[in-house]
Design a protein with these regions (language model features):
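Vicinal oxygen chelate
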Residues: 1-4, 9-18, 49-54, 72-153
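Conserved active-site tyrosine of GNAT-family acetyltransferases
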Residues: 23-28, 98
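Conserved acetyl-CoA-binding loop of GNAT-fold acetyltransferases
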Residues: 28-36, 102-104
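Conserved short beta-strand elements that form part of the metal-binding/catalytic scaffold
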Residues: 34-76, 115-145
Length: 153
């Protein structure tokens, strides 16, 4: 199948839990990852710590997420593996092409993500209009910057 974009690699893995503090004990204290920033959004019901491993274009984020309000949606702590982020060389072309193939996206379209890159999300479940999905896994498509495109192409 000829597609007008490439998936270059993994940008992030987002892990949800009831407590970022408990998640940090494992990922920072035990595994040795470094916290590089944080992000909070009442609208997205998320309070997250952004960790990293690797360097330069090979850096991968591990996002530790807890809900701002566990009674509201989205429930960023359930499932525990919240989503996976993929570097894309041309996000706009990818969204256009995938939509034509019948892939369902979450509301909101392309927007700035927590790490400052343009992102959009493939819905974990299809529907009648857009039957293709990632079968239960939320997938974030992330516009790769030039250095990542060069290194991973």
């Amino acid at each position: 199948m000829d597609r007008p974009f490439k998936v270059l690699g993994i940008q992030q893995v987002a892990i949800g839990g009831e407590s970022k503090q408990k998640l940090s004990k494992f990922w920072v204290d035990v595994m040795g990852l470094t916290k590089v920033s944080d992000y909070r959004s009442e609208k997205e019901n998320v309070d997250e710590d952004i960790l990293s491993m690797g360097h330069g274009p090979f850096k991968v984020e591990i996002d530790l997420m807890e809900p701002v309000d566990p009674t509201k949606s989205p429930k960023v702590h359930d499932p525990k593996l919240n989503h996976i982020g993929l570097w894309i060389d041309d996000l706009a072309k990818a969204v256009e092409w995938l939509t034509k193939q019948g892939v369902r996206f979450t509301p909101g379209g392309i927007r700035k993500g927590a790490a400052g890159y343009d992102v959009c999300f493939i819905h974990p479940k299809g529907n009648e209009e857009f039957p293709l999905s990632s079968e239960g896994v939320l997938v974030e498509l992330v516009q790769a910057p030039a250095d990542v495109i060069k290194a991973l192409s």
